[in-house]
């Protein structure tokens, strides 16, 4: 299969959630998020006003992903309104925050992860349907955003698996060989 055929097959299997990265500055974090989003077959990765990122950190997975670069918070919020996105912002220190284990992670969530220093933009926090915090037990201030994004995607998938739903689709069985693709 060539790359376009692989991407088309992946598109058939994708999950409906999206990942948005708000003004991230660490190029390795962005690449790692893209690689992890690929592992969970996210529909799309939205980069909001981010700095250039290292493709090497994505281990080539960016070639198979839908990555939209949005120049600003305003442009992202306009896109979110037009598309009817269900924004779930991940932020440690926000009013009315809900813990990851108790929050609502809908099928079509757009999970937003913020800048390493300043977190998610206050305007995005205000527009979010929910603000979620990932429990921390040590004295560290926060998780790296790539780790937080991975934990959130894993929790999204775990909930579907707990409901008895197939989280990682298996290839269709080949009628001639009787095995998966």
Task: Annotate each language-model stretch with its function.
Residues 1-181:
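Post-transcriptional modification and biogenesis factors for structured RNAs
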């Amino acid at each position: 299969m060539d790359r376009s055929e692989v991407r088309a097959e992946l598109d058939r299997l994708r999950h409906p959630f999206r990942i948005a990265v708000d003004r991230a500055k660490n190029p390795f974090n962005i690449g790692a998020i893209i690689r992890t989003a690929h592992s969970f077959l996210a529909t799309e990765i939205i980069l909001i006003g981010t700095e250039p990122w290292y493709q090497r950190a994505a281990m080539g997975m960016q070639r198979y992903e839908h990555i939209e670069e949005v120049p600003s918070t305003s442009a992202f919020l306009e896109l979110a309104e037009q598309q009817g996105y269900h924004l779930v912002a991940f932020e440690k220190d926000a009013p009315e925050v809900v813990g990851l284990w108790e929050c609502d992670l809908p099928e079509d969530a757009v999970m937003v992860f913020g800048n390493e220093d300043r977190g998610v933009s206050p305007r995005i926090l205000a527009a979010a349907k929910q603000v979620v915090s990932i429990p921390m037990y040590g004295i560290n201030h926060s998780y790296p955003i790539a780790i937080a994004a991975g934990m959130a995607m894993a929790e999204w998938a775990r909930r579907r698996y707990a409901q008895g739903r197939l989280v990682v689709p298996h290839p269709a069985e080949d009628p001639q060989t009787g095995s998966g693709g």
